[in-house]
């Protein structure tokens, strides 16, 4: 079996590339996916988002090694093992990232990936419902909507931010990210709008696109040229050959693992596992980054939260309405208000993100408070801690060693202390007076730096945004894995295009920029002239040098 292009992974970037590479009918595409079909309400019903990320049917089941700076806790790292990849098990929050994120990419060696370069691709991929005119796309495959915000707590959160002196923004994906405002969702007609729904399924209707179920074991190389992929399906091993190129889009965990199993990575590490060296790229598996967050929870004195919807009878009613009509509480992820703010004067653009939720519960649906409550997920966006993904053995079936080194930089502790105290300030505003009860978490007794630090060690969680392990950069950067056209340095016919190529993590959730990578990489693969650069200037707070708000 062979095709012009072979893509490993049907996730956010992989699905976008399958769609774009096959679009004009000139080239054939094979997408290799080990995961299951994305069928059923547990995947497609937005309110069921906590289920697929906890199910081995849909998730690769990765966890970090015990993290020494948070009391040896091992944090789960859900990655989608399903059509659509992690876009089929994520929280459906859509964030492009800040313009300065991409300018930093370009300045650090990923030339051609500045905001002016990537904005046209964001516009091309979006079908924005209600976004800022002129800044958003309206004809793309990816539907993006805002929630209805029927619950008054969503408005209280935005008003509280305004009362605290922060900006308000109607579209954080438009000209102005900074501020409090509505959150955007990849939901369409009451269903999760994953990369599979947006890109892969339309592509699979074309005669030149084929989906192959199989476990990718390694890249097949002839000398220093990639010519195919060895896969395992059942107990059968076979090679799918690529006439033009192999593109890895297997996630920030599996993409570096696959490179190393194929002889591309740190020479000493490959030798340790008896793997023949093809290209010594010491950056493979390094530069691992993530977003961490804590939940600041408050009791609600009015019975208006989702707490009353957590019993089995209510869940059944919500499920039936969604199955019949795709409406009601099942048709939203319930993340409908958000904020991006700056932590202090001298910070040019936001470095803190908020998700607001009208219930007190963990992101994975566990440990719900036994009362009406609301919460903010809050965390710094630009941690200085860096981790790694390395091989446990040369057996492709073994999970890799994942070390995030969470909270290993002292600045991370100061940033999180500020996040906790700032959230308390926001919840203390007059807008919450009609609703505010006692603080559930951390609890009023947690006040000093040491007490907050202990709370963080026990309760900090991953936001599930791993990236950076196949860093994009200049060819002469020894830690770069791919060049600015996503080509693996030192190997021909092989590219990586997913969140693993991010030089630095972006502001917010990663599904949006990962899809953008797939869109832009497709143009490089096809040898097309990039879309015309944008001349739109994003809003930067004129007071950034003297104030945090």
UniProtKB/Swiss-Prot annotation:
Q: Spell out the InterPro entries in the cross-references.
A: BetA (IPR011533), FAD/NAD-bd_sf (IPR036188), GMC_OxRdtase (IPR012132), GMC_OxRdtase_N (IPR000172), GMC_OxRtase_C (IPR007867)
Provide the active-site residues from the annotation.
Answer: 465
Instruction: Give the metabolic or biological pathway.
Output: Amine and polyamine biosynthesis; betaine biosynthesis via choline pathway; betaine aldehyde from choline (cytochrome c reductase route): step 1/1
Q: Which domain of life is it from?
A: Bacteria
BP GO annotations: glycine betaine biosynthetic process from choline
Q: Which UniProt keywords apply?
A: FAD, Flavoprotein, NAD, Oxidoreductase
Cofactor or coenzyme needed: FAD
- In this chain, FAD is annotated as bound at 4-33
Any single GO molecular-function term of the entry would be: flavin adenine dinucleotide binding
The protein's annotated catalytic reaction(s) are:
choline + A = betaine aldehyde + AH2; betaine aldehyde + NAD(+) + H2O = glycine betaine + NADH + 2 H(+)
Instruction: Tell me its EC number(s), please.
Output: 1.1.99.1, 1.2.1.8
Matches recorded under PANTHER family: CHOLINE DEHYDROGENASE, MITOCHONDRIAL, GLUCOSE-METHANOL-CHOLINE GMC OXIDOREDUCTASE
Q: Which family does it belong to?
A: Belongs to the GMC oxidoreductase family.
Give the function comment from the record: Involved in the biosynthesis of the osmoprotectant glycine betaine. Catalyzes the oxidation of choline to betaine aldehyde and betaine aldehyde to glycine betaine at the same rate.
Its recorded name reads Oxygen-dependent choline dehydrogenase
Q: Which gene encodes it?
A: betA
């Amino acid at each position: 079996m062979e095709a012009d292009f072979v893509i490993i992974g049907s996730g956010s970037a992989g699905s976008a590339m399958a769609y774009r590479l096959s679009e004009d009918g000139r080239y054939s595409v094979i997408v290799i996916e080990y995961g299951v079909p994305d069928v059923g309400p547990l995947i497609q019903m937005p309110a069921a988002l906590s289920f697929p990320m906890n199910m081995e049917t849909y998730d690769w089941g990765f966890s970090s090694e015990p993290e020494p700076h948070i009391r040896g806790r091992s944090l789960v790292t859900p990655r989608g093992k399903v059509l659509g990849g992690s876009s089929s098990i994520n929280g459906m929050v859509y964030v492009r990232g800040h313009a300065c994120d991409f300018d930093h990419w370009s300045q650090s060696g990923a030339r051609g990936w500045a905001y002016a370069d990537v904005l046209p691709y964001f516009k091309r991929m979006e079908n924005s419902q209600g976004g800022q005119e002129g800044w958003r796309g309206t004809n793309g495959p990816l539907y993006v909507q805002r929630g209805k915000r029927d619950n008054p707590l969503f408005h209280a959160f935005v008003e509280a931010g305004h009362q605290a002196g922060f900006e308000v923004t109607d579209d954080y994906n438009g000209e102005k990210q900074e501020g409090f405002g509505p959150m955007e969702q990849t939901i369409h007609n009451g269903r999760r709008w994953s990369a599979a729904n947006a890109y892969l399924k339309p592509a699979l209707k074309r005669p030149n696109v084929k989906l192959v179920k199989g476990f990718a074991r390694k890249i097949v190389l002839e000398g220093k040229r990639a010519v195919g992929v060895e896969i395992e399906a059942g107990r059968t091993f076979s090679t799918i050959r690529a006439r033009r190129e192999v593109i890895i889009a297997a996630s920030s965990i599996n993409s570096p693992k696959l490179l190393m199993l194929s002889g591309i990575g740190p020479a000493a590490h490959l030798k340790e596992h008896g793997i023949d060296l093809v290209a010594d790229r010491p950056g493979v598996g390094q530069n691992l980054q993530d977003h961490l967050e804590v939940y600041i929870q408050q009791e609600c004195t009015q019975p208006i939260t989702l707490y009353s919807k957590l019993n089995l009878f209510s869940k059944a009613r919500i499920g039936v309405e969604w199955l019949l009509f795709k409406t009601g509480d099942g048709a939203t992820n319930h993340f409908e208000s958000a904020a991006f703010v700056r932590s202090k004067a001298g910070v040019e653009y936001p470095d803190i993100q908020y998700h607001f939720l009208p219930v007190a519960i963990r992101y994975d649906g566990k440990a719900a408070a036994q009362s009406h409550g609301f919460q903010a997920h809050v965390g710094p966006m630009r941690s200085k801690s860096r981790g790694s993904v390395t091989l446990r053995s040369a057996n492709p079936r073994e999970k890799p060693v994942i070390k995030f080194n969470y909270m290993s930089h002292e600045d991370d502790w100061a940033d999180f202390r500020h996040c906790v105290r700032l959230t308390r300030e926001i919840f203390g505003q007059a807008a919450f007076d009609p609703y505010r009860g006692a603080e559930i978490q951390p609890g009023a007794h947690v006040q000093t730096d040491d007490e907050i630090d202990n709370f963080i060690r026990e309760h900090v969680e991953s936001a599930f945004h791993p990236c950076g392990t196949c860093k994009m950069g200049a060819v002469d950067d020894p830690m770069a894995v791919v060049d600015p056209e996503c080509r693996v340095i030192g190997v021909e016919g092989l590219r990586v295009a997913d969140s693993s190529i991010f030089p630095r993590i972006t502001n917010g959730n990663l599904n949006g920029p990962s899809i953008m990578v797939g869109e832009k990489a497709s143009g490089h693969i096809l040898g097309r002239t990039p879309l015309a650069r944008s001349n739109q200037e994003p809003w930067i707070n004129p007071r950034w040098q003297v104030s945090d708000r």
